[in-house]
Amino acid sequence: MKAVVALGANIGSPREQMDVAIALLREATEVKAVSNYYVTKPVGGPEQPDYLNAVCILESELPALDLLAVLQGIEKSLGRERDVRWGPRTIDLDLIQYGSLLSAAAELELPHPRAHERRFVLEPWFEIEPDAILLTHVKISEL
């Protein structure tokens, strides 16, 4: 199943942490494409440093919740703490879309409910998949 995963980091060594996260994703899934890294301003939350963001396209046989567990395990291994909503982080891995799966479950909403509002997701995704369609919306090039 094709999965779209957004990555972000803004404390510690963001580039190194994202490189390690991608390497760990390669161990757990088949990474098909990785965007360039983008420097972006934080959205919401407390005052904090700019983020480094990217998007990966993965191929995975894991069920969506199992893939989410892999992403959260990678975050934990890289020191992710969930103390402050939209606060600074060593790494953030968000499952944006998983095949054509639609989910409103509390533990996993798909597609990601705010992806269509987040330029730091849309621009890197467009770079590696210009014809992508965000389910429940339109082509990402039109957002």
Regions found by a protein language model. Name each.
Residues M1-A28, S35-K41:
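N-terminal beta1-alpha1 ligand-phosphate binding loop
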Residues G12, S35, P42-Y51, L62-L143:
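Flexible, gly/pro- and Lys/Arg-enriched active-site loops
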Residues M18, I22, V31, N53, ...:
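A general structural signal for well-ordered alpha-helical packing
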Residues E59:
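Extracellular and analogous surface-interaction loops
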